[in-house]
Amino acid sequence: MWRAGRAAVACEVCQSLVKHSSGIQRNVPLQKLHLVSRSIYRSHHPALKLQRPQLRTPFQQFSSLTHLSLHKLKLSPIKYGYQPRRNFWPARLAARLLKLRYIILGSAVGGGYTAKKTFDEWKDMIPDLSDYKWIVPDFIWEIDEYIDLEKIRKALPSSEDLASLAPDLDKITESLSLLKDFFTAGSPGETAFRATDHGSESDKHYRKVSDKEKIDQLQEELLHTQLKYQRILERLEKENKELRKLVLQKDDKGIHHRKLKKSLIDMYSEVLDVLSDYDASYNTQDHLPRVVVVGDQSAGKTSVLEMIAQARIFPRGSGEMMTRSPVKVTLSEGPHHVALFKDSSREFDLTKEEDLAALRHEIELRMRKNVKEGCTVSPETISLNVKGPGLQRMVLVDLPGVINTVTSGMAPDTKETIFSISKAYMQNPNAIILCIQDGSVDAERSIVTDLVSQMDPHGRRTIFVLTKVDLAEKNVASPSRIQQIIEGKLFPMKALGYFAVVTGKGNSSESIEAIREYEEEFFQNSKLLKTSMLKAHQVTTRNLSLAVSDCFWKMVRESVEQQADSFKATRFNLETEWKNNYPRLRELDRNELFEKAKNEILDEVISLSQVTPKHWEEILQQSLWERVSTHVIENIYLPAAQTMNSGTFNTTVDIKLKQWTDKQLPNKAVEVAWETLQEEFSRFMTEPKGKEHDDIFDKLKEAVKEESIKRHKWNDFAEDSLRVIQHNALEDRSISDKQQWDAAIYFMEEALQGRLKDTENAIENMIGPDWKKRWMYWKNRTQEQCVHNETKNELEKMLKVNDEHPAYLASDEITTVRKNLESRGVEVDPSLIKDTWHQVYRRHFLKTALNHCNLCRRGFYYYQRHFIDSELECNDVVLFWRIQRMLAITANTLRQQLTNTEVRRLEKNVKEVLEDFAEDGEKKVKLLTGKRVQLAEDLKKVREIQEKLDAFIEALHQEK
């Protein structure tokens, strides 16, 4: 009822609105009116022929009695005939965005409420700790009032200062990585840093290696590495020297270099170097003077030599052997104090401690290099030149110290080797022996004095030097004992002169100037000099150096001309022998012969490129067919020929050819090409060159050939390219002309006839000689051959009955043959029947195939026209044509690889081998041998020695 009353009130309101709206102009937009007002407006203005558009949504017709449900009604804009249509897409977009905002806002409110509720739940789960507040002291709550944190922060160091004090992690990481690489490199010294297991399985004890052993092992390994690089450096220096010679030889004629004048002592040192090599090669000893420094180990030999050279140039050790090979030191005067080795151009500045350390290290490396494995000392000499202001000109040789006992770590023959080296130098009648004796030890412990007295019993070329006189004066109770030594009354030896020197306080870091000052100060204050036990000219190393130099040059002037005359006589004898034995040959030493042989070998390698392509392809094709013919006939042709029709034959052939090409054929082809290249290379290297052929190079050429072939490897990609080419060649079945057809038939006949001949020989060996050979050569058959002959005859009868018999015998056929033979009294085994059948059927098949081959000579027309004739199927001819074409294409491909790539690579290998042989002196001595080579070597050495001696003698006379 209340709804009906409410509707009636609404109708009255509407009617009143209509009455008052009669004055509204008609141009008022209808869209601005309310929906209800629009319906009233249209009912009172029928002149407006408005067309109501169809609503897109279902709706209800409203009246005054119906309920207005505006939230369910969706109206669309109304089109009027006189008003254009308007599009309100911004309004629709805004409405959608407003709806999205409400969704987001609602979600945010709901999420915040949920988060607050979760936080409250967690807060309620935390226990209340207010009851335990009494445990904390009261001053804790007031501590911030008494502590000024700002002052503490200022008192602490800054972050930059802390960073500067911190270790450099990059450097530490780099050092650790270097140590890790060093210890994991598999070096021999690696085990020194590992614990050694000495316990049982249950209880293991580890023993740590001492620091000294670790350092020694590291130094040993470092020295080995340096020795290796030292060899490389020497080889490079040798190459540089050879290149320098070549540059000088190719100098322009218009440019003349000024010849540097060498000093007298340098010329003499070069003579000694050449003589040293000559003596080592021919086990002889020259008689030119040199100062030989000998003494007991740790007697001070090296220190005396360093005082004379005015530089600490030798490695030093505390009581251990440091001089492991003779060191020849040539002293000469010069503006700068420098040292250099004979075989190196590097100069060491002896005024700089860095260069001195490098020189000592270099000498130690050279000594270790000279010492062979299993030895302690070496007789090979290290040549060193020292120049400086105030140095006395002479040549000294520092020898290893004489020992009395061989200690652990030394070779068993160390003592004898040192004695033999010392005797070899002291046996020279013109050598000056500088005998060094330690004054701080008892004279009875001396070993070297006995050795010197044996070599120079009259003391005509011996100078005695007493070292460590300062220690001797302190330790010896009777000073007269030192006087007896200096006067030559204590030791059983004689000498030209006696000297007393002081070579330092025992500190290896002392400089030469400090040692000289200490020596002069000691002798100025010494009781020995004040009491006239020692004379002034017998003390200090300076006086010793002057005396040794005077004695040295006196010996040189007396003996050098005699030595030159002896070499002149030797040269005359060698030249006479050469003229009598080799009058038409030039005198070529081993190096010159090697260069000549090198040029000949390279010319012969170049000859490989002169081989014609036709010759390459012929020998390649022939060699390849010889290698693969057995496989083609036995594994491809014969199995396929047993088939009944041409389709099966072609299928079998294609399958077997594909398998053969994929697996074996390319590899076989490369092997054949490599063997062919070797044969041609050997032919050029070994073929005689007529009367001009020199057999002295034969061993060298053979060695170069073998080493080059060993190093040469065929290109790895050759097989892959060959496989594709061979596969494509075998796939082709179209024979284009009659000439190719005839060539294939000839190729097939030749192959089958060769197999037939082999089969005939096998049958002949099986059945024995025929009646003609038995009568003419008196040969008989064995019992087994008779059985084979009877079996063969029986099987041939079977083949005559059935000309198209398959390749295998059936079991009943074997039984029939055996019964027939037994009926004639021949006992035969089934396996013997099968073996005989194999050869008999093989001969029958090959003869049939040859007859068929003759028939196919006229079959090219049928093949070309594709006629189907069962009596004339020439598929086997096509097979052999495919094989022949594959061989030709393969030979052509291999020839291109040979001429374009492999010959050049072989030539490169030959050059590398020759370069390696040129650097290996032992290899040249082994390969270039003979009386002629040795005689030329002797002539070259003797001429060089004589020329240097003559130049030295001339300069010596000019100096006089």
UniProtKB/Swiss-Prot annotation:
This is Dynamin-like GTPase OPA1, mitochondrial. Residues 589-836, 874-928 are annotated as: Stalk region. It comes from Mus musculus (Mouse). Residues 771-781 dip into the membrane without crossing it. The paddle region plays a major role in driving mitochondrial inner membrane fusion. It binds lipid membranes enriched in negatively charged phospholipids, such as cardiolipin, and promotes membrane tubulation. A conserved intramembrane region, named membrane insertion loop (MIL), within the paddle region inserts deeply into the bilayer, further stabilizing the interactions with cardiolipin-enriched membranes. OPA1 dimerization through the paddle domain promotes the helical assembly of a flexible OPA1 lattice on the membrane, driving mitochondrial fusion in cells. Keywords: Acetylation, Apoptosis, Coiled coil, Disulfide bond, GTP-binding, Hydrolase, Lipid-binding, Magnesium, Membrane, Metal-binding, Mitochondrion, Mitochondrion inner membrane, Nucleotide-binding, Transit peptide, Transmembrane, Transmembrane helix. Oligomeric complex consisting of membrane-bound and soluble forms of OPA1. Interacts with RCC1L; RCC1L acts as a guanine nucleotide exchange factor (GEF) for OPA1 by exchanging bound GDP for free GTP. Interacts with CHCHD3 and IMMT; these interactions occur preferentially with soluble OPA1 forms. Interacts with PRELID1. The chain crosses the membrane at residues 97-113. Dynamin-related GTPase that is essential for normal mitochondrial morphology by mediating fusion of the mitochondrial inner membranes, regulating cristae morphology and maintaining respiratory chain function. Exists in two forms: the transmembrane, long form (Dynamin-like GTPase OPA1, long form; L-OPA1), which is tethered to the inner mitochondrial membrane, and the short soluble form (Dynamin-like GTPase OPA1, short form; S-OPA1), which results from proteolytic cleavage and localizes in the intermembrane space. The lineage of its organism: Eukaryota, Metazoa, Chordata, Craniata, Vertebrata. Residues 210-254, 895-960 form a coiled coil. It catalyses: GTP + H2O = GDP + phosphate + H(+).
